[in-house]
């Protein structure tokens, strides 16, 4: 882990807290503290969105209309402006961000808003070899009502690289976390899978981790070179609903998925 890899936690009424990597889930997964369930319902609603550093109008109205009822909001390119932090802390018990790089005023990176405090938090970063800008990922774990633990992986994959070596390298520590977790998993975000080799690497990783891809009937996901960039993968859950919200509030469209934590599909 790089020494400058950390997460910042935002909670209402408390100062921002720096969270350092705890190490592999393999070493501490059996000793996690008890926590409140992410949801008291028989469903888990998530919103996944590259928010484009909040550079366009209406981003806040989209979050207010579609994010406030979600149990999890997985943002990429989230810039910790006062407006976003205020929304996050007013509507969620915890908001964890992994700063990928610091813009003139506010850090930008993946950010996970959750209706419960995570019992595990592991920030990850990978530097793009060409632009030398970092992309971040965040692994968090939440209790479910059925006593299982849900692992959530929020990913913004490296974009500019020659070949797929760095792309695959970024997935390795994520795979280490998932491989040592026996419960359900949601892995989602902007995977920048704009080439056939990248797509193959991502699908191969998903197969190795026994992850399924959420399918969208009216697939309005952002595309590059004809390939979707945003994905939701899962394991140990059922998909109830999945849709893509078409909006001009970012250069990506938000993904809305509802899961049920009951008996997984066969």
Curated annotation (Swiss-Prot):
Domain of life: Bacteria
Pfam families to which the protein is assigned, alphabetical: Exo_endo_phos (PF03372)
InterPro entries membership: Endo/exonu/phosph_ase_sf, Endo/exonuclease/phosphatase, UPF0294
Protein localization: Cytoplasm
Keyword Membrane: no
Gene Ontology MF terms: catalytic activity
Keywords: Cytoplasm
Presence of the UniProt keyword tRNA-binding in the record: no
Subcellular location, principal: cytoplasm
One Gene Ontology cellular component: cytoplasm
Record SUPFAM superfamilies: DNase I-like
HAMAP family hit by this protein: UPF0294 (MF_01119)
NCBIfam families xref list: PRK05421.1-1, PRK05421.1-2, PRK05421.1-3, PRK05421.1-4
Family membership: Belongs to the UPF0294 family.
Record protein name field: UPF0294 protein YafD
UniProt source species: Salmonella typhi
Lineage: Bacteria, Pseudomonadati, Pseudomonadota, Gammaproteobacteria, Enterobacterales
Gene name tied to this protein: yafD
């Amino acid at each position: 882990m790089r020494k400058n890899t950390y997460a910042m936690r935002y909670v209402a009424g408390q100062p921002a807290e720096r969270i350092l990597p705890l190490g592999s889930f393999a070493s501490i997964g059996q000793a996690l503290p008890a926590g409140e369930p992410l949801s008291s319902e028989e469903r888990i609603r998530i919103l996944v969105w590259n928010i484009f550093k909040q550079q366009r109008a209406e981003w806040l109205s989209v979050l207010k209309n579609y994010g406030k009822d979600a149990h999890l909001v997985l943002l990429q390119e989230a810039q910790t402006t006062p407006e976003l932090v205020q929304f996050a802390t007013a509507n969620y018990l915890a908001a964890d961000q992994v700063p990928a790089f610091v813009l003139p005023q506010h850090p930008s990176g993946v950010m996970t808003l959750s209706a419960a405090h995570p019992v595990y938090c592991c920030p990850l970063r990978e530097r793009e070899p060409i632009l030398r800008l970092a992309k971040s990922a965040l692994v968090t774990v939440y209790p479910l009502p059925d006593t299982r633990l849900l692992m959530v992986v929020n990913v913004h994959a490296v974009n500019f690289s020659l070949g797929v070596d760095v792309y695959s390298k970024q997935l390795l520590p994520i795979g280490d976390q998932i491989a040592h977790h026996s419960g359900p998993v949601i892995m989602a975000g902007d995977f920048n899978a704009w080439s056939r080799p990248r797509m193959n690497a991502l699908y191969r990783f998903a197969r190795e981790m026994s992850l399924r891809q959420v399918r969208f009937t009216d697939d309005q996901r952002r595309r590059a070179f004809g390939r979707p960039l945003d994905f939701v993968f899962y394991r140990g859950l059922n998909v109830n609903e999945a849709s893509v919200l078409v909006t001009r509030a970012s250069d990506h469209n938000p993904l809305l998925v509802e899961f049920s934590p009951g008996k997984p599909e066969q």
